[in-house]
Amino acid sequence: MNLNKILKLIPKTDLHCHLDGSLRPETILDIAYKENIPLPNKELANFQEEIKVIGKCTSLKEYLNKFNLPIQIMQKEEHIYRVTLELLEDALKQNIKYIEIRFAPFNHLKDGLTLDQVINTVLTAMNYGRTHLNIMSNLILCILRQEPVEKGIELVNTAKKYVGKGVVAVDLAGNESDFPPEIHEEAFTLARKYGLHRTVHAGETGLPENIIKSINILGAERIGHGTYAYKDKEIITCLKENRIPLEVCITSNVNTSAVTSYQEHPIKKYLDEDLIITVNTDNTTVSNTNLIEEFNYLIKYQSFRFDDIKKVIKNGIESSFASKEDINKLYEEYLSAINVIELTNPIL
């Protein structure tokens, strides 16, 4: 059995996947035509340069510009439903059995939709995926760092209505360099009060202190990226002692120049130091990747062995914000697949 077949056989999770960064290019093109949205390039091959990063950007800010067009076409319920369902279909092709989709609802109100309409549309598609496609999913709502504090509070108050109905957490995303975590403390305090989980993008772009702030001030239960944790031993100790998982997205970190190369990424060092590491896509379209590709990069550039792969996939199940019932189901499927693989590939 070759490596890709082995990776495909194992049921996986993706805990860090942005909806607006994971649209099919042909869908963006199709909706743009229907909505008369002007395009810089109308041929699919050339157009993809507008929404994908091939290689590196000079910064996270440049990387985030790739989201402009996808957000522009996600302003109607039918389009939001379509791209959500397509993301679930694409995840299934990677044998992802549980995915936490995240996005910022405030980005999708330009044509008159309400927060409730946007959130309900995504949840409706996700419910269809669970019942008809056999893929489990939950929704994480992103507060944008650069937005007024009041918007974050409004989003959390809206999210409260969907606790137990598919919305499991809030996230803090966006320009980390200019907007530190503590700005949005009130929103995260409310989220905890309402029973919402908390994950925060932190330490992605060279500010390791944001990791500690996110944990201590915002009550983060997971950290998105955490790439620069190695800069401070105190942070490594904090992550280890508090058993805070990192949502690692290796290709994205190369794209944003958070790391210079796949080889230089600290993921294997973190894993060897017994941090809880999960492997995720971040943005399948913008980063031009998928989950199996991420594992292939880890094998090629980080010398991941089969035991490492098993460990991070198991971490993904255990670190998820899924219900206990869903976690147990995922774990049973994972163990079953691992048993088959190890019986048929004893040299692994």
From Swiss-Prot:
Q: What InterPro entries has UniProt attached to this entry?
A: A_deaminase, A_deaminase_dom, Ado/ade_deaminase, Metal_Hydrolase
Q: Spell out the molecular function terms from Gene Ontology.
A: 2'-deoxyadenosine deaminase activity; adenosine deaminase activity; zinc ion binding
* Residues the record lists as binding substrate: 18, 20, 174
Specify the superkingdom. Bacteria
Residues with site note (Important for catalytic activity): 225
Cofactor list: Zn(2+)
Query: Could you confirm whether the keyword Metal-binding appears in this record?
Result: yes
Report the active site residues.
204 (proton donor)
The kind of enzyme this is, by top-level EC class, is hydrolase
Q: Name one GO biological process term.
A: adenosine catabolic process
NCBIfam families for this protein: aden_deam
Q: What does this protein do?
A: Catalyzes the hydrolytic deamination of adenosine and 2-deoxyadenosine.
Name by which UniProt lists this protein: Adenosine deaminase
